[in-house]
């Protein structure tokens, strides 16, 4: 199963792609889509949509996982972040991908085993799980963590279905 994880942002949207092969997690790619904060906001949303659409077309993931971000410094920031999430989700849905959403606490729990883990702990565990020496951008690291969360959650959902 190939998973595209997304860490949405109106200025920087991180993405990370992993593959679950048996019980191993394999890093495929990661990066970020940068938008110009001086451009019209609708054009920035379009850049997020187009950028993720290209990533989806190139890597052909089986699923998309998006972090639910609800912390913002003010109402305007929260609205912009929600719109960036929407652009990312529409890119996935337009490509026919199932889209799942996870809170930051769920991601931390799945990656580190502790829902209140610090950002550095999550980044360190992502590097360890994916056998990476470094991850260039924090946004990409967060996106990889979301992908790991989804891959592990999908396995658990499958196990629970087989028990029932």
Curated annotation (Swiss-Prot):
Active site per the UniProt annotation: 7, 67, 139
Keyword Hydrolase in record: yes
Reaction catalysed by this enzyme: Endonucleolytic cleavage at a junction such as a reciprocal single-stranded crossover between two homologous DNA duplexes (Holliday junction)
GO molecular function: crossover junction DNA endonuclease activity; DNA binding; magnesium ion binding
Co-factor: note: Binds 2 Mg(2+) ion per subunit.
Residues annotated to bind Mg(2+) 2: 67
Single GO BP term: DNA recombination
EC main group: hydrolase
EC number per UniProt: 3.1.21.10
Keyword Lipoprotein: no
Coiled-coil boundaries: none
HAMAP family: RuvC
UniProt subunit comment: Homodimer which binds Holliday junction (HJ) DNA. The HJ becomes 2-fold symmetrical on binding to RuvC with unstacked arms; it has a different conformation from HJ DNA in complex with RuvA. In the full resolvosome a probable DNA-RuvA(4)-RuvB(12)-RuvC(2) complex forms which resolves the HJ.
PANTHER family documented for this protein: CROSSOVER JUNCTION ENDODEOXYRIBONUCLEASE RUVC (PTHR30194:SF3)
Role of this protein: The RuvA-RuvB-RuvC complex processes Holliday junction (HJ) DNA during genetic recombination and DNA repair. Endonuclease that resolves HJ intermediates. Cleaves cruciform DNA by making single-stranded nicks across the HJ at symmetrical positions within the homologous arms, yielding a 5'-phosphate and a 3'-hydroxyl group; requires a central core of homology in the junction. The consensus cleavage sequence is 5'-(A/T)TT(C/G)-3'. Cleavage occurs on the 3'-side of the TT dinucleotide at the point of strand exchange.
Protein name: Crossover junction endodeoxyribonuclease RuvC
Gene from which the chain derives: ruvC
